[in-house]
Regions:
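An N-terminal assembly and electron-transfer interface module characteristic of large anaerobic redox
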Residues: 1-211
Length: 211
C-alpha cells in the first residue's frame, strides 16, 4: 500500500495501516515528517518511510516492490558440477536450477557457426577500439557461446544464467571464455553471472530489475 501523507497530523492513519500488517510505503514530504513521527514508525516491520520532496523516491521504492515479484518469477540456471536439481531461495522465491557443466560445453560443440554468430562476431570486432589478441575465430567462438547460452536458457525454461566459466576454460572443454556472451546478455538486460556464483548473479539481477 502506498500512503501519501499531506499533513503532520495524518500519522495516525499511517499507524492504522502498519498495525494491519500490510506492507506499506509511506511518502511523507518534507514538512510532514519530523523525528518524533518517524523515529519509531520507520522501524516497524513491513514499513518503508520516504521523507523527501522528490517523488522519484516513491518510484524507486515501487521498483523494489516490482523487483521482489520478478525475483519470485525467475528461474536462475546454474551450470556447474555433475548433478541436476532445483531448489527455491528462501524469502525471494527465486527458483535455482542446477545442471551438469557438461550440458553447456556438449551443446557448444554441437552449435554450428551460424549466420547469427558470424554477425555478432563481426559487430563486436567492428565496434572495438582496438584488438590486441583475439583472432577472428576467437570472436566467432565467443559468439557461439552466446548462441549456446540462449539455447540453453530456452531448453531449461530459465531467465538468467551463471556458469562455471573458469572450470570450462582450464579444462579446455571450450576454446574461448564466455565473457563476451556474458557482456551481450547484460547489455540486453538478461543476467549472465560468472563462476556459477548464485549470489553474484542475484546481485546482477537486482540491478537489472531496478532499472
Amino acid at each position: 500500500v502506498l500512503v501519501h501523507l499531506q499533513h503532520l497530523g495524518s500519522w495516525a492513519k499511517a499507524e492504522v495501516v502498519a498495525k494491519a500488517g500490510v506492507p506499506a510505503i509511506v511518502f511523507a514530504p518534507v514538512g510532514t515528517a519530523f523525528t518524533r513521527q518517524v523515529n519509531l514508525f520507520s522501524r516497524k516491520p513491513g514499513v518503508h518511510v520516504i521523507s523527501s520532496l522528490e517523488t522519484k523516491a516513491v518510484e524507486q521504492a515501487l521498483r523494489m516492490v516490482r523487483a521482489k515479484k520478478q525475483f519470485a518469477e525467475t528461474r536462475l540456471l546454474v551450470v556447474q558440477g555433475d548433478k541436476r536439481e532445483e531448489t527455491v531461495m528462501e524469502h525471494l522465491g527465486t527458483k535455482v536450477r542446477r545442471i551438469p557443466r557438461d550440458t553447456y560445453h556438449e551443446l557448444f560443440q554441437k552449435m554450428p557457426e551460424t549466420e547469427e554468430a558470424h554477425e555478432i562476431a563481426k559487430s563486436m570486432r567492428k565496434g572495438a577500439k582496438d584488438i590486441i589478441e583475439p583472432s577472428k575465430q576467437d570472436t566467432i567462438n565467443a559468439a557461439r557461446s552466446f548462441v549456446t547460452a540462449k539455447h540453453l536458457l530456452k531448453m531449461e525454461e530459465s531467465n538468467a544464467i551463471t556458469t562455471d566459466c573458469l572450470g570450462m576454460v582450464t579444462t579446455q572443454v571450450v576454446p574461448t571464455p564466455p565473457c563476451m556472451a556474458a557482456t551481450l546478455f547484460q547489455d540486453g538486460g538478461v543476467t549472465y553471472g560468472c563462476e556459477a556464483d548464485v549470489f553474484g548473479a542475484m546481485s546482477l539481477m537486482l540491478t537489472s530489475y531496478l532499472l
